[in-house]
Amino acid sequence: MNSLSIFFIVVATAAVCLLFIQGYSIYENYGNIKEFNATHAALEYSKSIGGTPALDRRVQDVNDTISDVKQKWRCVAYPGNGFVSASIFGFQAEVGPNNTRSIRKFNTMAQCIDFTFSDVINIDIYNPCVAPNINNVECQFLKSVL
């Protein structure tokens, strides 16, 4: 055996030992790791201390660039029937004749989620809380879900 092969054997043995030590460390602290993950799971996609948003970049959606919770779009059950997509900006809207806007309602939560978080840019928004309708039922509902 020459010195080069001995060197590679020592390096390989050290690497294997480090892997075993790391594996044993994880094995010994597995309960603590699970407890830490359970405690901090709600903060997984929250804004980090450094000011950079910690975002899930695997899937692009409308909430990725928003850090204010009230501005984020969400699907909520609408009184009576169906679901609506809401944020502080208002509701996703259906545009009718003469450019009249009404709240877009969905039959299921899955339909609401698919529409709200699809790749299509949904720019039709109906905000019932602008003058002169500040105290109507739709505005009160919007304020209650934010």
From Swiss-Prot:
Keywords: Disulfide bond, Fusion of virus membrane with host membrane, Late protein, Membrane, Phosphoprotein, Signal-anchor, Transmembrane, Transmembrane helix, Viral envelope protein, Viral penetration into host cytoplasm, Virion, Virus entry into host cell. Residues 22-146 are virion surface. GO terms for biological process: membrane fusion involved in viral entry into host cell; symbiont entry into host cell. The chain crosses the membrane at residues 1-21. It is found in: Virion membrane. Part of a stable entry-fusion complex (EFC) which is at least composed of proteins OPG143, OPG147, OPG155, OPG086, OPG094, OPG107, OPG104, and OPG099. Formation of the viral membrane is necessary for the assembly of the complex. Interacts directly with protein OPG107. Belongs to the orthopoxvirus OPG155 protein family. Envelope protein required for virus entry into host cell and for cell-cell fusion (syncytium formation). This is Envelope protein OPG155. It comes from Camelpox virus (strain CMS). The lineage of its organism: Viruses, Varidnaviria, Bamfordvirae, Nucleocytoviricota, Pokkesviricetes. The gene is OPG155.
